[in-house]
Amino acid sequence: ADAAVAASAALAVTTPHMCGMGGDLFALVHAAPGPPDVLNAAGRAGSGADPDRLRAEGLRVMPFTGDVRAAPVPGCVDGWCALHERHGRLPLAEVLGPALRLATGGFPASPLLVATLPRLEGVEGCEELTSIRPRPGDRVVRPGVARMLAAVAEGGRDAFYRGEFGAALLAVGAGEYTDDDLAESGASWRPPVGRRVWGHDVWTPPPVSQGYLSVLGAAVAEAVAGADLPDPEGDGGAGAWAHLLVEAARLAGHDRPAMLHDGADGDALVSDDRVAAAAAGFSPDRRAEVRGLGAGGGTIHLCAVDAEGTGVSLIQSNASGYGSLVAVPGTGVLLHNRGVGFSLEPGHPAEYGPGRRPPHTLAPALVTRPDGSLHTVLGTMGGDSQPQIVLQLLARVLAAGESIGRAVRAPRWVLASGTGQGFDTWTAGEPIVRVEADAPAAWVEGLRRRGHEVTVASELDVAGFGHAHGITIDEDGTRIGEADPRAIVGAAIATA
């Protein structure tokens, strides 16, 4: 847990284009045989949230950027503190030390950071990023974020939410947030959602996470094909493999806008009845006729397993790149835009309103054996496509018997709308299937023959296919980790 918090904090410093202290966080923690604990650190809309006002302004959907109302109270720091309080061993100041040193002493700018910094042009209150024009490798310092980290290290969550950051958030919020919104931790521990699939127990966070789609999709694929899945790369079965999993994801996810909201029953969403109903729509020869309701994300996933076998699957996000493009002045912190998940339809179960949590794309996963021991921690960035990518990893590791390394490196597909936004797969009409350039030709031919609309990405286009990572623990305790080559990342083993 200490390693997960330390890595998450370091990424909050070095990858502001994907995550930060102004975002949200989920984690699955397996510390003893049995189901994992789930940490939900998704923030709630402020007390000033008023859907009628947005509708009166002529909005039919939530603002995406440039509007503080797109940002519920950030939950990330509450998540760090809650995870450390329950499972940490080292002092919090020591855990946050590496991130603080990166913020004060600087870190080399990555090519992706350099390429995305122009998106902040015109954003006020974040001069530590808007005033620099680094080249790849140039040193970047984050003095405002360093002060915020130092406050958390010394005084915990209250020093952040009730200190300089909190005061500045109330000011920039202009009535969207109140003192009471910041008084209590927004993080809570919850039981997971899960079911047995391919001989293992697959776990994800409950709603508001969309993680149930990974479990439901895997269960649908198993119900249709059992454990004997087609060969994902062979000419004879590759098209059937791709069709099976694409359809499992579509049949599981097409009604997500109506089903996923704060307070939704996660167990009911992966029930036997739901699995059977979805599986009944599958045909091996053609695309099912399912519809959503009509009309590039910024996230990181990390995982860690310690010497005692405690495993953490953690995901942290700004939602979209630099989030709402609203900075909390003087702090170096950019606010996320997770409020884009709310609905402005009157009476909708996910309607924007005070104290409500929006539906979340964040969907980490964890797998245990029937005896309750830890098998795999895994997850990915990728907006709406996260459960689809996790489904493909689960199918390869649990059903096809592949190593986590081969599964992570293997070609992928994702479902996507035509907008490229990454958060409207199920609300912008029938999604298309985007396939990586190195995928087997049989995938494309087999999917098109069955009625799917397919586009093939260019060789340089890997951004839309997630950055997945995982650690598998063999029965003898051997850890095998894989970091996605699509990202600038790594897997490491440390001894103390």
Give the ranges of each region predicted by the language model.
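Active-site rim segments in enzyme catalytic domains, especially the processed small/beta chain
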Residues: 9-40, 176-178, 310-376, 386-387, ...
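Extended C-terminal subregions enriched in glycine
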Residues: 242, 253, 258, 262-267, ...
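Amphipathic alpha-helical
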Residues: 148, 161-184, 262-284, 308, ...
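Internal maturation/activation junctions in enzymes
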Residues: 226-317, 331, 338, 458
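Short beta-strand scaffold segments in enzyme catalytic cores
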Residues: 10-11, 19, 23-31, 300-305, ...
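Short, small/polar residue-rich loop motifs at catalytic or cofactor-binding pockets
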Residues: 189, 296-299, 360-362
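Alpha-helical support elements that line or immediately flank enzyme active sites
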Residues: 78-86, 154-168, 221-222, 380-405, ...
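Noncatalytic scaffold domains of N-terminal-nucleophile
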Residues: 2-156, 160-162, 166-202, 206-209, ...
